[in-house]
Amino acid sequence: MQTAPTGGAMIAIEATETEIRDTLPTHHGHLDIAAVNTPHSTVITGDHDAAHQLATTWRNNGRRTKQLNVSHAFHSPHMDNILNDFHTTAATLTYHTPTIPIISNLTGQPATTEQLTNPHYWVQHLRHTVRFNDGIHHLHHHNVTTYIELGP
């Protein structure tokens, strides 16, 4: 992680994933969606200036925004140059079959043992959108009322 480029930003915006996705092309690949936390809370990630420009647009339209206190623009192209090294490190770990069900933040669905014990899965997790809202929706649909979130 230390070799990932600095200078990025992550900002939570009171907007749907679709609303945010519709505005991303105007930023020419400098931004991506880091996380979909709720139906109306989406986190953007990428270049600092582009992220703040987009957040200002949403704020000027009456939406709440909050910059996240992070060291890097995770889940964005800023991570691309460390993915190979991350995979190399992840491949040295010993993985075990989970003893409790785990919902994947990549899919919002139950993760398989094959996924959770594969270094490539964790590389994807570093780079792609966190589908937290989809996971909560899946749990709710299956009448789960108690959750444990594990993260950094």
What are these regions (language model features)?
Residues 1-150:
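Acyltransferase
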